[in-house]
C-alpha cells in the first residue's frame, strides 16, 4: 500500500500563512489545509507512514482543518490557522468541476460505458512536501509543482470536492476499472469526493486497524457526511448494481415463454373470474368443459364425463348404464370390443378370456385338445402330424409308431424315455421282449453270439433249435432218396 492521498495545494494569502515547526524525521504530520508549499530542507525530509489516511472527521465544520488518522485510528488535527476562505474562488472552482465532468463524460462515452462521476475518480497524490527545521515562518515555494510520484494505493482517501483545482490531475495515473459490486452492508450511498477505484487485478482486501472496512473494489469509511461533504443528488447515484460498471450494463435474465404455463394460468384466472353457478363436479374428460348440475355427468375411467360425452370410441353409442370395456383409457361397447378380439383357430369364436398360442395360432384353452383322445393339452407336451393335427405324445405314437410282428402292438418309448428302441430282423420289427426263439422261446439278443438269432425258412430260431431243425431236414432228405 502506498502513502496517503494528499490534498492538492492552493495559493493562500501571504499575510495569513501559518507558523510551522520542525518535525523529527519519520514523524507523521499533516500538510497545511490550504496548501502552503513548504521549502525542502537539505538534511531533514518528511516521510509519511503508509498507514496514514486523510479524511474529514464526522460532525466537524470544514474550516477546522484536516483530520488525520494515525496508526491507531485516533483523529489528530494539524496545528495551523483556519483555512482562508478568501482564496477559494467558488466561481472558478465550479467552472473547473463542470469542465472536468464534461471531459470525463466524453472520454467514457467513446469507450462504450457509462460516464464516471467526479466522486469516482482516484486522484493521484502529489509529492509530500518537506518540513524545514527552525522556528521561522514558513514561506510558499515559488517553484513549479513537484513531479507526480508512482501510482498510489487503490485505497483512495475521501477528498472534499471544494478543494479541486486546475492543477489536480484529471484522472489516475494507472488504468481504473470501476466494478459494480454486490450490495455492501454498513455503507451508505456514495458521497461526493469519495474515490472507488480498483487496479487491474486487486488482491483480497481486509479491514485495517484505525480505518474503515474495505468492501469490493474501493475504500469507504463508516462515517456520516460532515458539513463540508455534499450528498449526491437523487437519481445520480443508486445502489450497487443499479448503474453499469466497467463491465457493461447488467441485463436481467429473461425466461423463455412457456405456452403450457401461460395457458394454465389463463385458465385458472378464467375459472376464478367465472365460478360455476350450480353444483360443480369437475372438468369433462371428453370435451374439457365443466360438469355442473346433479345428473349431468358420469364417473368412469377415474374421470368425470358429461352424459353425452361418455360414448363408445367406435360406434359413438352412449354408455351410461351399459357394460363397457376399457382399452388404453378408451371405452368400448361390448359389440365393438368383441370385434377387436382374436378368434379361436378351432371354433372361430372371439377369445374373451385367456389366449393359448401354438404354432402361430390363437386358441381357447378348452379348444386346444388331442384329436384322438380329446384331452386338453394346456401345459402338456404335444406334437402334430403331417396334416397339422394336434396329438398328445401317447396317441401320436400309437397312431404312427411301428408295429411289433409278434404281438402286433405299437413299439413306443419306455416310460420316462423319449426314444423308441426296437429290434428289426427279417424286415420285421420286434419289441425287445418279443424277440424270442419260435421253438423254445429263448429270449434272443442282437449282441450275444450264443443267444443270437439263427433264422431258418423265415423263422426266428436260436442256435440249438436251428441246428436240430437242420439235422431233421437232412435226415428226411436221405430217407427219401
UniProtKB/Swiss-Prot annotation:
Subcellular location: Cytoplasm, Cytoskeleton; Cell junction, Focal adhesion; Nucleus; Cytoplasm
SUPFAM superfamilies: Glucocorticoid receptor-like (DNA-binding domain)
Region of interest called Disordered, as start-end residue ranges on this chain: 1-259
Chief site of localization: cytoplasm
A GO molecular-function descriptor: metal ion binding
Transmembrane annotation, as ranges: none
Omega-N-methylarginine sites (modified residues): 25, 111, 185, 192, 211, 243
The keyword Metal-binding appears for this protein: yes
Modified residues (Asymmetric dimethylarginine): 25
CC annotations in GO: cytoplasm; cytoskeleton; cytosol; focal adhesion; nucleus; plasma membrane; stress fiber
InterPro entries for this protein: Znf_LIM (IPR001781)
Biased composition (Pro residues): 1-12
Subunit organization: Specifically interacts with the ligand binding domain of the thyroid receptor (TR) in the presence of thyroid hormone. Interacts (via the third LIM domain and C-terminus) with PTPN13 (via the second PDZ domain). Interacts (via the second LIM domain or via the third LIM domain plus C-terminus) with PDLIM4 (via PDZ domain). Found in a complex with PTPN13 and PDLIM4. Interacts with SVIL isoform 2. Interacts with LPAR2 but not other LPA receptors. Interacts with PRKAA2. Interacts with MAGI1. Interacts with SCRIB.
Family: Belongs to the zyxin/ajuba family.
Stated role: Relays signals from the cell surface to the nucleus to weaken adherens junction and promote actin cytoskeleton reorganization and cell invasiveness. Involved in lysophosphatidic acid-induced cell adhesion and migration. Acts as a transcriptional coactivator for NF-kappa-B and JUN, and mediates the transrepression of these transcription factors induced by glucocorticoid receptor.
Domain notes: The LIM zinc-binding domains mediate interaction with LPAR2.
UniProt-recorded name of the protein: Thyroid receptor-interacting protein 6
Organism whose genome encodes this protein: Bos taurus (Bovine)
Species classification: Eukaryota, Metazoa, Chordata, Craniata, Vertebrata
Name of the coding gene: TRIP6
